[in-house]
Amino acid sequence: LSMGIAYGGPTLDQTGTTAQTNLDTALVRGGDQVVVKEAKDEAKPLFFGGKTAVTTKRSQVRSRAMSMAIKGIIAESADIYIMGHRYPDMDALGSAFGVARLASFNNRKAWIVLDENEIIPDVKRVLEAIKEYPELEERIISPKEAMKRKKESSLLVMVDYHKPSLSISQELYERFDKVVIIDHHRRGDEFPAKPLLSYIESSASSASELVTELIEYQSNSANKLQAFEATMMLAGIVVDTKSFNTRTTARTFDVAS
C-alpha cells in the first residue's frame, strides 16, 4: 500500500496534483510507503515506510511500452546525448552504450558524455579496450564538446541516476529541454522538472538490466547489440548485484542470459 498526501496549496486542484505526484514518487521508490509534501515548489517531501525488500513490480507490458515510447522520442530528436552520474561505474557506462545502440537502431547519432578527469580504474580499463572498436570509441565526447554540438531538438538521456546535481556536467544538463531518465535507484527529492519520460524501476538490479529489456523489444536481424556492448552491460549488472548476490531477481538472470 502506498499513499501520496499534499496540503497547503493555493487551490484544491494544485493540492490534488501534488498529492498525485507524491503517490507517483512513492510507487517509483518501490512502494509500501507514504510521501507527504506541501504543495509548494520549494517544499521538501517526507518519506514514511518503504523498509520492506523491493519486489519485482514491473511487467513485460510496461517494459515494451517504455521501449516504444523511447523509440518515438528518439525519432523526434535531432541527435542523442547520454550522460551518467559523476565518476561513472560500469553500470552507468554499460547502460549508456546500450542507449546509444538504441539510437542507432532508429538512425540517430548518439554521443556518450564522459569527463576524463572523473574516471574510475575499472572504467579506465574498459576505455583502453574500447580503442579496438573505433565505432564505439568515436561516440565518447567531453561535456565541452557536447555543448558545442547540441542542437535545439537534441535529447539528453540520463542513465543510472536522476538527480541533476550528480550529472557529469550540470551545465550541460541545464542546456536541454528534452530529457529522458532511465534509472534503478529510488526516486529522491531532487528530480528534473519536466522530463519527457521517466523510467525508474527500483525493483531492477541495475540500469543495464532496464536498458537490455528496452533493446530486446527493438532488436531484430538488422539491429543487434555488438558483443563488446553486451559485455559492458553484463559487467554493469555484475557490479551492481555484487556478482548476482544482491538485488537479483529472475528477470535479472533472464536479462543476463
Region roles according to the model:
Residues 2-4, 17-46:
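Catalytic/regulatory signature loops of cyclic-dinucleotide turnover enzymes
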Residues 46-77:
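Positively charged, low-complexity intrinsically disordered leader regions
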Residues 64-67, 74-88, 95-108, 189-257:
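A structured phosphate/pyrophosphate-recognition subdomain
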Residues 1-2, 6-7, 157:
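Alpha-helical/coil-rich non-catalytic "connector" segments in signaling and regulatory proteins
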Residues 139-194:
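Active-site cofactor/cluster-binding pocket
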Residues 77, 81-152:
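Anionic-ligand anchoring segments at beta-strand to alpha-helix junctions in alpha/beta enzyme folds, i.e.
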Residues 7, 38, 114-115:
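Residue-level recognition of beta-strand->loop/alpha-helix junctions
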Residues 85-86, 116, 159-162, 182-185, ...:
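Fold-independent oxyanion-binding glycine-rich loops
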